[in-house]
UniProtKB/Swiss-Prot annotation:
Its EC number is 3.6.-.-. It comes from Gluconacetobacter diazotrophicus (strain ATCC 49037 / DSM 5601 / CCUG 37298 / CIP 103539 / LMG 7603 / PAl5). GTP binds at residues 230-235, 249-255, 274-277. Belongs to the TRAFAC class TrmE-Era-EngA-EngB-Septin-like GTPase superfamily. TrmE GTPase family. Binds 1 potassium ion per subunit. Residues 220-361 form the TrmE-type G domain. The gene is mnmE. Exhibits a very high intrinsic GTPase hydrolysis rate. Involved in the addition of a carboxymethylaminomethyl (cmnm) group at the wobble position (U34) of certain tRNAs, forming tRNA-cmnm(5)s(2)U34. Coiled coil: none annotated. (6S)-5-formyl-5,6,7,8-tetrahydrofolate binds at residues 24, 85, 124, 435. It is found in: Cytoplasm. Mg(2+) binds at residues 234, 255. This is tRNA modification GTPase MnmE.
Amino acid sequence: MPTEQMPIFALATGAGRAAIAVMRLTGAGCGDMLQRLCGPLPPPRQASLRGLWRRDAAAAPVLLDRALVLWFPGPRSYTGEDSAELHLHAGPAVIAGVADALVALGARPAEPGEFTRRAFAHGRLDLIEAEGIADLIDAETEAQRRQALDQADGTLSRIYDGWAARLRTLLAHQEALIDFPDEDLPPGVEQALLDDLTALRSEMQAHLDDGGRGEKLRRGLVFTIVGAPNVGKSSLLNALAGRDAAIVSAIAGTTRDAIEIRVVLGDVPVTLIDTAGLRETQDEIEAEGVRRALFHVKHADCVIAMFDGETVPDDIPADAIRVRNKVDLAPVPAGADAIGISVRQGTGMDALRTALAERARALTASAAGPPLTRARHRAAIEETAGHLAAALDMHWPEMRGEEMRLAMRALGRLTGAVGVEDLLDTVFGQFCIGK
C-alpha cells in the first residue's frame, strides 16, 4: 500500500500527566483495524465506551484500556478518509500499549501535519484554510484567534476563489476575441473586458495595500526600547514583563546585547527588546551592542525612545513613543511630547501601557475586509496583479491572453489549486503531530 494511503495514528493531545489522551487514526482499512481493536464499529459520530484489546494469534487477548471510541466514516471526516478517535486514559503505558497494537495492525505513526495534508489532498480544505488551522493552533491572543478562525473558515478563500472565477470568465472572453476575430461579436466586448481586468487588478492592489496588518498580527509585533545608558531601559523592560528579565545596575553600559521578552499589549503579542545604551564608546563589545541596538531600531514596528533629561536620543523615528523616566526627580515640562514615568515608583506606568496597547492595535487593526496573513499570499497576489497589469498593456490579443493565463496560474498557487507540490512540505511541516 502506498505510504500516503496507509493508516496513520497520532496523539492529538499534548504530552504530560493528564486524565485523557486522544489518539487519532485515519486511512484505508481504518475500520477493519478498529473492529479488531474494539469489536463492532460504533454508530458514526457517536461516542461509545469500548474495551480496547491487543489480539495476538499466539496468545490470549489482552485488555489495554476501556475508552470512548468515535467512528467517522469517509468522506464525512476531517481527512476525507475513514477515521476514528480513541479517548484513552492518559497513562504512558496505556498510550504506548495502544500505539503498539495499532502498529501491529498495520498503521504507522503520523508525520507532523499529515492529517491536515490528507484533508487537503481529498479536497476537504484548500491551502489557505490549512494555514488558517495552523495559525489557530498557534494563536496566543483573542485577536489572533479571530483572524485565524476567519481564514480557517474560508473567508479569504472565498475572496480568492471569486477572483479566480472572474478571471476565468474574462479569459474565456479573451479567447473568443482571439478565435473569432471576424465574427459579429457584441460591440464594446473588448473594452468591457479591459475595464473588468482593471477593476479586478484594483481590488487586488487594495488588498495588498493593507500595511501588512494581518501578517503583523499573526507573527506579533516588535517594540524596541532605546536610549542613552542608564536611563532605565532594563527597568522598563522588567516592569512591562512583570518579572526580572534583564539585569539592572547603576553602572552605565551594563546591557551589551539585546534582551527579548514576549508580552501581550492590546490583545497583540509583542516582543519587547531591551538594547544597549546609545553612546560613543571605545569598548569593542559595547560598540557592537550599540550597532545591534541601531539595527533593532531600524527593524522595529515601534520604537520606545527613553530618556531622563530633555534631549531625545538621535536617529529615532518620528513616530517613536517618547518616554521620560525619573519624573520623581524632575517632572516633565508642560507641553513636552513625552509620557512621563517613574519606573522605580510606578508613576505613569498605566498611561504608558495604554499608549503601547493603542499603538499595537493601530498597527494590526484591519480597516476593511480580511487581511493578508502570510508573505506567501502577498507574493502570489503581487505576481497575479503584475500579470494583469502586463495584460492591460498588451495590444496583441494573443499576448494579452497569455498574461491572463499566467495570472490564473499564480492565483491557483495561492489556494493550492495548481503547482504547489514544492510548498506542501513547508506548509504542513509547521503543524504539530496529530493535526
